[in-house]
């Protein structure tokens, strides 16, 4: 609570490559917003994700626009360009620094997949990150939230720095969506309708000259 009893604004931060954004991302963000009483969830598409340099990543502007399309119908969802406009490799520490500067009085909650937490102590400036935001680890299909690698990471973190929750188990991944698009298989109901249409219009995830069937 802020001085005078006024409740602090609670801001969720969902960073990701979003290549493409899919319904699993949206369900996870909605579930976290409900459970933690968030006022807003800001989606932050990465510029150049440092951990995915081994594969080609769709252009940042395309990923940004797909995220805008996907989140437009939910009044609690917004999209930020901080990682894209910064340039260079994207690190979570920079995302949180920028959003803290833009929202100095808000409580920040960083939303990530539970599987990413196994290596969280190797992230750049992880101590600083936990001083800026609380972390919410959400389950992904086939992943055990109480795995020993997660427990080991949590043992090194400050109290109340990290929460683990389960979300409806939608077996959707961006990788599968890309593969289906490459093979001209439908991606309806895996991603929002507007994203299906954007992928087809921009001929994403296909070799040059090959059409895409939504």
UniProtKB/Swiss-Prot annotation:
Q: What class of enzyme is it?
A: transferase
Pathway field of the UniProt record reads:
Cofactor biosynthesis; NAD(+) biosynthesis; deamido-NAD(+) from nicotinate D-ribonucleotide: step 1/1
Q: Which Gene3D superfamilies match?
A: HUPs (3.40.50.620)
The positions making up the signal sequence are none
Q: Provide any one GO MF term from the record.
A: nicotinate-nucleotide adenylyltransferase activity
Q: Which InterPro entries match?
A: Cyt_trans-like (IPR004821), NadD/NMNAT (IPR005248), Rossmann-like_a/b/a_fold (IPR014729)
List the GO biological process terms.
NAD biosynthetic process
Q: Which UniProt keywords apply?
A: ATP-binding, NAD, Nucleotide-binding, Nucleotidyltransferase, Pyridine nucleotide biosynthesis, Transferase
Catalytic reaction(s) noted: nicotinate beta-D-ribonucleotide + ATP + H(+) = deamido-NAD(+) + diphosphate
State which Enzyme Commission number(s) the record gives: 2.7.7.18
- HAMAP family tied to this protein: NaMN_adenylyltr
Q: What is the protein's known function?
A: Catalyzes the reversible adenylation of nicotinate mononucleotide (NaMN) to nicotinic acid adenine dinucleotide (NaAD).
Assigned protein family? Belongs to the NadD family.
- Indicate what this protein is called per its UniProt record: Probable nicotinate-nucleotide adenylyltransferase
* Lineage of origin: Bacteria, Bacillati, Actinomycetota, Actinomycetes, Mycobacteriales
Q: Which gene encodes it?
A: nadD
């Amino acid at each position: 609570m802020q001085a005078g009893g006024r409740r602090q604004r609670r801001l969720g931060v969902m960073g990701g490559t979003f290549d493409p954004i899919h319904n699993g991302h949206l369900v996870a963000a909605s579930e976290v917003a409900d459970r933690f009483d968030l006022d807003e969830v800001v989606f932050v598409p990465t510029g150049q994700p440092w951990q995915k340099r081994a594969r080609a990543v769709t252009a940042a502007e395309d990923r940004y626009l797909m995220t805008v399309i996907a989140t437009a119908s939910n009044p609690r969802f917004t999209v930020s360009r901080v990682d894209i406009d910064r340039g260079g490799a994207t690190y979570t520490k920079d995302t949180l620094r920028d959003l803290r500067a833009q929202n100095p009085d808000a409580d920040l909650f960083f939303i990530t997949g539970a599987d990413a937490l196994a290596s969280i102590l190797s992230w750049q400036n992880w101590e600083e990150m936990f001083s800026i935001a609380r972390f919410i680890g959400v389950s992904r299909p086939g992943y055990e939230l109480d795995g020993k690698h997660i427990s080991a990471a949590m043992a090194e973190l400050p109290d109340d720095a990290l929460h683990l929750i389960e979300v409806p188990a939608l077996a959707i991944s961006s990788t599968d969506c890309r593969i289906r698009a490459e093979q001209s298989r439908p991606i309806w109901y895996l991603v929002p309708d507007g994203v299906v249409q954007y992928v087809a219009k921009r001929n994403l995830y296909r070799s040059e000259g090959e059409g895409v069937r939504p």
